[in-house]
């Protein structure tokens, strides 16, 4: 009989912790989820129990982003064996005076939402895209050739490019462009008859006819200067040169251009070359009339 009682006691001793574990798990399931967060990990230290006792639930911890969290002197010097009387005052009471921090920090920043919502990260464009994308009002005014990359644009002079219509420019094929572009860019060279050396007749300079510019033979520079230039070979003003298209302009050799000496361009004034030296008098700057360190009465007496 005694043996039976002993075996029952031993069995109860082994079964007791298992029953406690099962009861704890049932309590864990039935508890409020805010309290369950505190008991998620097994607590082995008494200090940890007291710290968890002061922590807020997770729903209240979100207010820490808006409300500053200060430890009072009572909590700072607190021994973990004794709890403060008012737990809420111990956590929220600020050690910093209200004069240092504005009153806004002690209130929750519940500001009204702005009507204009900020752009999301996907809608915000980078600097390069903002720089490269043309604006809406520029799309209507920018020609198509300028919107193309530089290497795809036609390499034509300005007066030729404007003379071509838009549909003519687009109708040109790629191989036609390659042929036409160098022809348009070439300067105007008049056609002349090429004679062999045996067929050329060299006349003395007095008997030579004064030929046109395109019929004139190739001469040395010092012989060309002897020939009188025609009226049309005279140098036109710069504005007339620019009005005429480039192929129709006459190419004037440099020895026929009207050159001016640097002294004849503008009347040289001696003061422009070397300005007048003005003597610098530092007296009024160093010693003012009414200095600030003397009173007006002393100045009147002196």
Curated annotation (Swiss-Prot):
Gene Ontology cellular component list: extracellular region
Principal subcellular localisation of the protein: secreted
Signal peptide (from-to): 1-15
Domain of life: Eukaryota
Keywords: Milk protein, Phosphoprotein, Repeat, Secreted, Signal
Sequence repeats: 144-151, 152-159, 160-167, 168-175, 176-182, 183-190, 191-198, 199-204, 205-214, 215-222, 223-230, 231-238, 241-247, 248-255, 256-262, 263-269
Keyword Nucleus: no
Residue span of region 16 X approximate tandem repeats: 144-269
Tissue expr: Mammary gland specific. Secreted in milk.
Subcellular location: Secreted
Gene induction: Maximal induction is dependent upon prolactin and insulin.
Phosphoserine PTM sites in chain numbering: 23, 25
Family, similarity comment: Belongs to the beta-casein family.
Function: Important role in determination of the surface properties of the casein micelles.
Descriptive protein name: Beta-casein
Species of origin: Notamacropus eugenii (Tammar wallaby)
